[in-house]
């Protein structure tokens, strides 16, 4: 596939400027056995599984002039209900509050492959856009009937259908309200005001991310403290920048947990040793340092409103960026997560150490 939208070069420069890479990259001796170093990583991901993922959306004009939207995607905290409502509202020239979203119900919802593979905004978003465009055209057709003219002569501004050039209108009226159209849709009408659109993409355009991290490493204990993490993401056009930002911040936190803390080991009986949160360590807010997230935009022509995905890419850069920073601080590459203090000390003590198996036997 050819990447039609890529702002990775701008992401690198933006990230380096905000992070002050030139100042933080040199290894600095802080005394007491502690050094500071910086690392960076680049990542790309997909926006769906091309030719596999399917998303659908049903939009219905209610009798009070608002809309109901039914989707098969489940909002698991990613904010897809909000984002898809925003997309429909943009096409229908209304407020997102005018759209009531009904989430996944296998008995009633249109089919969706699922909220996975970073595909909801890209795949179900396109289905939502297409459904909204079709419903908009049907609203114009019903409005044109009430105005006694052809649908090509009217437009819709979200509140009423109006004649673009009112001269010569048969019944003298130049506009009809959305509520009147909703009422007309229930009487002697053959134009549907509930439409379903389904979409699957032949391509999977990649979003991009740059992550830069500054650490302080204690050479006497192997402990790593994160000071700053700067991220710049190209996810196409961010439909909801606030949701995109917190999605990125959360993913960075998860990536830091994977890189430094989280591990699964098995005892001799085959049972997981870390079977509760007392043993399975995840980072808290004080463990992730200062996180700053910015965006560089690109327009993806195959996505709704130019979007690409952001779901999974945000977890990809912390581990390699931290590995780079630890290498800068110690001269040893670590390739198996988590990068625990024990592994870091072993690596500094034995240059030929290759991360021997530390699992419980």
For each feature predicted by the language model, list its residue ranges:
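Conserved beta-alpha junction segments in alpha/beta enzyme cores
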Residues: 38-66, 71, 78
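C-terminal catalytic domains of large/alpha subunits in multi-subunit enzymes
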Residues: 1-41, 45, 87-361
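Thiamine diphosphate
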Residues: 80-88
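Generic recognition of short, well-ordered alpha-helical segments
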Residues: 10, 54, 82-83
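Short, contiguous strand/loop micro-motifs
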Residues: 71-75, 309-310
């Amino acid at each position: 596939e050819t990447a039609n939208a890529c702002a990775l070069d701008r992401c690198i420069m933006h990230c380096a400027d905000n992070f002050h890479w030139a100042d933080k990259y040199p290894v600095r001796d802080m005394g007491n056995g502690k050094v500071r170093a910086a690392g960076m990583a680049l990542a790309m991901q997909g926006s769906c599984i091309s030719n596999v993922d399917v998303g659908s959306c049903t939009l219905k004009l209610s009798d009070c002039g608002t809309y109901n939207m039914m989707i098969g995607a489940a909002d698991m905290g990613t904010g897809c209900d909000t984002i898809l409502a925003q997309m429909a509202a943009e096409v229908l020239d209304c407020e997102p509050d005018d759209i009531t979203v009904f989430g996944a119900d296998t008995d009633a919802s249109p089919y969706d492959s699922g909220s996975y593979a970073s595909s909801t905004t890209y795949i179900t978003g396109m289905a939502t856009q297409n459904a909204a465009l079709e419903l908009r055209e049907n609203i114009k057709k019903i409005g044109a009937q009430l105005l006694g003219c052809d649908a090509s002569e009217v437009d819709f501004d979200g509140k009423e259908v109006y004649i673009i050039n009112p001269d010569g209108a048969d019944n003298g009226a130049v506009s009809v309200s959305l509520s009147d159209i909703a009422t007309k849709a229930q009487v002697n009408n053959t134009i549907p005001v509930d439409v379903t659109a389904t979409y699957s993409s032949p391509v999977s355009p990649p979003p991009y991310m740059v992550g830069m991290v500054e650490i302080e490493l204690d050479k006497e204990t192997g402990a790593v403290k994160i000071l700053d993490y700067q991220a710049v993401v190209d996810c196409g056009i961010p439909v909801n920048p606030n949701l995109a930002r917190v999605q990125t911040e959360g993913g960075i936190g998860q990536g830091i947990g994977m890189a430094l803390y989280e591990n699964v080991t098995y005892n001799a009986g085959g049972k997981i040793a870390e079977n509760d949160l007392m043993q399975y360590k995840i980072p808290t807010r004080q463990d992730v340092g200062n996180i700053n997230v910015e965006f560089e935009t690109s327009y993806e022509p195959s996505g709704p409103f130019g979007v690409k995905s952001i779901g999974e890419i945000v977890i990809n850069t912390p581990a390699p960026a931290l590995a780079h920073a630890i290498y800068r601080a110690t001269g040893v590459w670590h390739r198996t997560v988590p990068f625990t203090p024990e592994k870091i000390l072993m690596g500094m003590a034995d240059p030929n150490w290759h991360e021997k198996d530390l699992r419980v036997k």
